[in-house]
């Protein structure tokens, strides 16, 4: 008889949620984790960055409160205390996951996992001792790690993992290589605190994988906040330059140099499955990711993979949804989440949140669409908060009127995109989504204005 019915490798948002769901469905479950419960998201990613952004927003608003009668003197940011706050939040949430495991009678096996065969996992402790476990099924949820491309001198730059370890002082200046989600959130954090920030992006705009207007609008807002932005810029090398680091890059066929006390490499992440399989044991790969079918099965029988290690979309909530769907299918339970509808958020100011197709993507796919838009100059809550130019765009099929996408750039966009995702998952038309009364004053009432514009265009 096997030791467990399911062994989950990795206690991140995909792994721990899958384990909890499997235990609730009656499985005997173990989770292998060599670091803190919660994985990258909780300890080196989503939650730490949001904690830092919460702290920097308090500083920014206090420092800039004179326009509404709030006057402060001698305000300063203590970086050691900010990072201590970040650690305390992560530790509290990590401890909460371990408590959930105990309540659900899930065994947390501390150590590094090695898959020695179908249904066989060896767990090595830090001291080198190892124990072998058998199981009916294995779920790989090992996540991803920061990428560092082969650019000369890039080893001098930090990754997000290293930056989040903390620093006891505020950098005078920082150069961020990469204008995607990770780079933009760190740019926001350091700009809020008064650090001189430069962002270098290789594509023609920030957030190149999103709607064009989002990246263009973000660049304008960041520049107003004092951030230098270079696009169509390819980094050639990084060098030590006295106390600073010099980043050399080409922009419009001209070589440029910008220096900073620190450099962050935020070019992306890669699937992490290093050393996961014993010699002679392996699975089919899709590039550097583990290949899976629609049911998350790998080429090795009874071995499954979810989240960043196998998914094209590297988001914590995607890993969670995939993990839950995987174990529900294993247990013969009908899964209910539409995995094709994926909201995505960027926690800059104003926030950005998207779901579904952009107008350009729909047209490339041959889908006839109409777009409704509302610029929030007259939205009362936006005028009060004054985060910069905000807008909402909604995309619908021109013939069926079914909503197919949305792009929000406004305060609390991350808290509103879930409602739009619900509309997409349930195939609501623009007219159906417009029926709901939205509260006033609120940021969300701009959704009604965007929907009314969309309905007029649909006819």
Regions found by a protein language model. Name each.
Residues 19, 23, 187, 191-192:
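Gly/Ala-rich phosphate-binding loop of Rossmann-like dinucleotide-binding domains
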